[in-house]
Amino acid sequence: MNTVRVRDIEIGAGVPKICVPIVGVTKEDIIAEAKTFHEIPVDVVEWRVDWFEGVFDFDQVLDVLKDLREALGNTPLLMTFRTSKEGGEKAIEDAAYAELNIKAAQSGYVDLVDVEVFTGDEIVKEIIEGAHAAGVKVVASNHDFFKTPAKEDIVNRLRKMQDLGADIPKIAVMPQNKKDVLTLLAATEEMVSEYADRPIITMSMAGTGVISRLCGEVFGSALTFGAAKKASAPGQMGVNDLNTVLQLLHNAL
């Protein structure tokens, strides 16, 4: 299993890394929140750019990225436009989606970009190639806010992301019951033990699935999302509590 290194953080080694999302609407809110992150345990910051009011004007995006980079110091930055079809705030045309991600990668301010794997293989490949050419890593993602697919389906989606060249495959699914959480954990273990040659990120959402955000080191999920202020997905814990549990489990393993 290879790890993925972004700045001083090694994803896929030891304790699962903690990623904290920023979901501010205005530049002022986004930068103000970023400036508080030195007070909390955070390994990676995700800017959910789909929440930003100026997202469709790249000059405004670049302006925020520049100040975000300064506010975050050496903390790695993941930029994510989560589309409305996968639970995000806005819809976007494929060409604009590719351009936004590639331009962000080329800016020198971001360390990772997120690409939704079901955008279409050609667009996904274009973004991955563009990001890699700029020295930026790619998280390929898929989110199902309604159900938990079968174990084989989850594994196949993660394998598809790996085959397309993403550095870190990621899937988030919604449990209808406790058995669905076990399905996600079993799929994670199978992917890691049989197919993955790189770190993966998996989670079962909402309160029912919260255990999956805590036990990544046991089953093989390399990064987990915690909330500093507003959660960006159902089931996210506060970052301090999350860190406490991750460390307790790590010390017992």
Predicted regions and their residues:
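Short amphipathic alpha-helical surface micro-motifs
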Residues: M1-R5, Q60-V61, T183-L184, A206-G207
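Catalytic alpha/beta core domains of metabolic enzymes, predominantly
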Residues: L112, V117-L253
